[in-house]
């Protein structure tokens, strides 16, 4: 079986009911993380998460493994005490099962009320600033897909014509940037260019992406970002430079090389992401450190050095006194 837009809503509703019964906690997840096959997930969660193969939530979902040889599955657990739902082994449109199947986890998290989304992907760096292993954070993106992930899904949207000018949530981005700065070099803002397929690009494709201002060249990330924002979610996206493809330096590389970079950088990602999730949760709850009220410095000093009227200062003997003035006779 496969999806069409007329049955997509019903399939999502059924999957949400099944998933709600299988979550380890009755508390609704606060975060949704979308992870590719490149990252080592050991230690991401406070304890081993519950794992649910995605195809068990709907008969219309494919059972076949992804092009990376992964089984797409949902992980449910806690990170720094915050309930999180994650999708691991992301399926891509190029797998051949359609965009609706690839986007199913993102849409499912949205309709379940999980409104804070972070997407992670490994892509090809096109500029010298992003060396292999360097993280970027999406400030904007360009999509070359011939279709929109919203086609036929307008019944799910609050607005049939969503404004994509502010897709990325800058407030959430700030919390993530600050958190990751404590664990190495913070990610830099970047422009992501998404193209169809799942291939390693030609030099001409890379040059065209640079010409439109892109820092990274990748694939399906843009589709998830658009759908998530259109469904009313707070969206952030981190992209890792798996390899670097610079002008004038043509080179050959493999998908395995990109995956190795992702595995190598998983530790830094894990530390920064755990802190970021906690900080975003605190910010959403209006958490703030206790800040002392402003005081006048003179009043503070006076209050702290004032002597009791019943006690004398041990320095009293050293006080200078002016001699008494004598009135003229």
Where are the model-predicted features located?
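Zn-dependent metallopeptidase/amidohydrolase metal-coordination segment
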Residues: 220-258
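Histidine/lysine/aspartate-rich catalytic loop segments that bind and position anionic ligands
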Residues: 141-142, 146, 151-198
């Amino acid at each position: 079986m496969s999806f069409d837009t007329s049955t997509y809503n019903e399939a999502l509703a059924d999957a949400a009911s099944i998933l709600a019964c299988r979550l380890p906690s009755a508390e609704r997840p606060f975060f949704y993380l979308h992870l590719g096959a490149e990252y080592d997930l050991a230690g991401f969660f406070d304890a081993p998460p519950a794992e649910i193969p995605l195809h068990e939530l709907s008969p219309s979902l494919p059972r076949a493994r992804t092009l990376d040889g992964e089984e797409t599955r949902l992980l449910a657990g806690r990170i720094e005490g915050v309930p999180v739902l994650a999708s691991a082994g992301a399926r891509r449109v190029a797998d051949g099962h359609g965009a609706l199947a690839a986007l199913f986890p993102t849409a499912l998290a949205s309709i379940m009320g999980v409104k804070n989304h972070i997407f992670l992907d490994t892509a090809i760096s096109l500029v010298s600033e992003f060396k292999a292993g360097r993280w970027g954070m999406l400030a904007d993106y360009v999509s070359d897909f011939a279709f929109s992930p919203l086609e036929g899904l307008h019944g799910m949207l609050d607005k049939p014509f969503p404004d994509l000018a502010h897709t990325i949530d800058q407030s959430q981005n700030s919390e993530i940037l600050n958190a990751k700065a404590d664990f190495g070099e913070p990610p830099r803002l970047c422009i992501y260019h998404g193209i169809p397929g799942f291939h390693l690009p030609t030099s001409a494709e890379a040059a065209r992406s640079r010409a439109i201002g892109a820092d990274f060249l990748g694939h399906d990330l843009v589709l998830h970002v658009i759908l998530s924002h259109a469904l009313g979610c707070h969206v952030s996206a981190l992209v890792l430079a798996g390899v670097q493809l610079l002008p004038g330096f043509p080179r050959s590389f493999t998908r395995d090389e990109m995956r190795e970079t992702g595995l190598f950088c998983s530790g830094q990602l894990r530390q920064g992401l755990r802190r970021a999730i906690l900080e975003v949760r605190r910010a959403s709850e209006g958490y703030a450190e206790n800040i002392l009220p402003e005081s006048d410095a003179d009043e503070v000093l006076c209050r702290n050095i004032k002597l009791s009227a019943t006690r004398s200062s041990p320095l009293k003997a050293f006080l200078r006194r002016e001699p008494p003035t004598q009135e003229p006779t």
